[in-house]
Amino acid sequence: MWRSFPAPQRPIAKTGFSSAWSKELVALLKNIRSSGEDALAMPGSIYGAIGLCQFMPTNISHYGADGNGDGVVNLFTVPDAVASLANYLAQHGWNKAATRAQKQKVIKTYNRIDIYANTILGLAEAQGYVAE
């Protein structure tokens, strides 16, 4: 796989086979290549999460979705970030008919903190998006 990278990037790509953090780096490099993003201008968390929905780079290939139909998954655009997060939640069991407890469990696959899941559900309920 690392041979598919241009020669100057191969040493970095090779590390993808030796450690957990390097898998995130390799996934990030692949995403940058396909999206055309500027790697030096790309903001991210101290843990490596990127985009409006703060996905780890390895999650982009699994859950990233092209929400605006431009053929590119760019988690820094609202349509793609929303579509990607919706895809993530759907693949983890979200459905409209689920109970509040089931929905909370799905949200906690994204962020394990109880207060986070309760806040998201509370905000959604206040806006009429989720049945109480």
Which residue stretches match the model-derived regions?
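Catalytic glycan-binding domains that act on GlcNAc-containing polysaccharides
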Residues: M1-E132
